[in-house]
Amino acid sequence: MLADSLKVLLATSYVFSIKAQNFHWNVEGQNFPQYHDFFGELYSEVYDNTIDRCAEFIRALDSYTPGSMARFAELSVIEEQTKIPRAELMVAELFENNTKMIELLNEIFPIANEQNQGIANFIAERIDAHGKHGWMLRSILKKNRE
């Protein structure tokens, strides 16, 4: 059911956004300003362009949105982070989570494409956005070429 898939997307996006925001607040060490800015842009982009739109699509499908942290944690395909890892590990974790997000979006797309073109367009936009996030995260993780 499309609404159920969107609930998983909503929960996963929320957990991803909160994790990036947590890292934005708590990152330390060398290159702090760059990490701080990047994590801030990442959580803002996901929050601003996914959360409310996804919830509204769920409601438009005559279903109710999950609305508690417990329910988001239960539905999400990624886990929350309760510790403060080193900056490099923050990036690696977000890269792994972003990859799972892309996989989820790719699972939802054919369902949406069959049932609702507006939602399919939204999912396609999110695939593109998370593809860009993946490129940036992967580039940060690469060792300098010599």
What kind of region is each of these model predictions?
Residues 1, 16-42, 104-119:
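Helix-loop segments that flank and shape redox-cofactor active sites
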Residues 5-6, 56, 74-128:
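Acidic/histidine-rich alpha-helical segments that form the ligand environment
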Residues 9:
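Glycine-rich anion/phosphate-binding loop at the beta-strand->alpha-helix junction
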Residues 12-23, 49-50, 97-105, 133:
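Amphipathic, well-ordered alpha-helical segments in soluble domains
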Residues 27, 57-58, 65, 109-112, ...:
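Leucine-rich amphipathic alpha-helices with coiled-coil/heptad-repeat character
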Residues 31-69:
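Conserved alpha-helical segments that form or flank metal/cofactor-binding pockets of metalloenzymes
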Residues 59-71, 94-97, 143-146:
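Short alpha-helical linear motifs
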Residues 120-146:
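Short, contiguous alpha-helical
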